[in-house]
């Protein structure tokens, strides 16, 4: 039997980078990217599969309408999500690479994951083997441990916010209702 937790731990150790801080990029514009197609829609806009024209790297781009954000009184939530993602970088979360805006929209350029969310896989397969379940749980534990070490509480762990990558690793996404862990949050 494969030791799932040591496999996940080894991936974390191999990919440890100095923590990167992502700052909003005033010099970036959506014209720096080739928009390939829409991969999702949400309350504020669309999620695109894009490619950097400079590096050819593919990403997911969250395009959010400023008007919709204001109409739904969600400025604080969107700003918090961007702020949390700008300080987090881990192999088991969906990482943000860039953040920028134009007069109409806010943009978050994030890791592109093609494996679908866990809700889709649960509805498709109905159940997972014990080994696969342990593997997903180990991924989530490492991600949550890292998130908590950085004083962030996710507050919305559910199958739709757990996305699989091509190699089968599970990553946490959607920090929209996350909160900073303050001493009085205990």
Where are these regions (language model features)?
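Eukaryotic serine/threonine protein kinase catalytic domain
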Residues: 24-186
């Amino acid at each position: 039997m494969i030791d799932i937790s040591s496999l996940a731990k080894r991936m974390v150790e191999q990919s440890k980078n100095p923590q990167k801080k992502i700052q909003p990029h005033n010099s970036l514009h959506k014209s720096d990217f080739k928009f390939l197609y829409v991969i999702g829609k949400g309350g504020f806009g669309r999620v695109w599969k894009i490619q950097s024209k400079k590096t050819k790297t593919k990403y997911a781009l969250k395009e959010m309408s400023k008007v919709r954000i204001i109409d739904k009184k969600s400025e604080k939530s969107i700003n918090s999500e961007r702020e949390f993602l700008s300080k987090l970088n881990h192999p088991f979360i969906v990482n943000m690479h860039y953040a920028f805006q134009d007069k109409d929209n806010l943009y978050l350029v994030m890791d592109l994951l093609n494996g679908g969310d866990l809700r889709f896989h649960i509805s498709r397969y109905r159940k997972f083997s014990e080994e696969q379940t342990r593997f997903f749980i180990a991924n989530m534990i490492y991600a949550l441990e890292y998130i908590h070490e950085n004083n962030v509480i996710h507050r919305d762990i559910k199958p739709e916010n757990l996305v699989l990558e091509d190699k089968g690793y599970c990553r946490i996404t959607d920090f929209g209702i996350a909160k900073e862990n303050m001493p009085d949050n205990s």
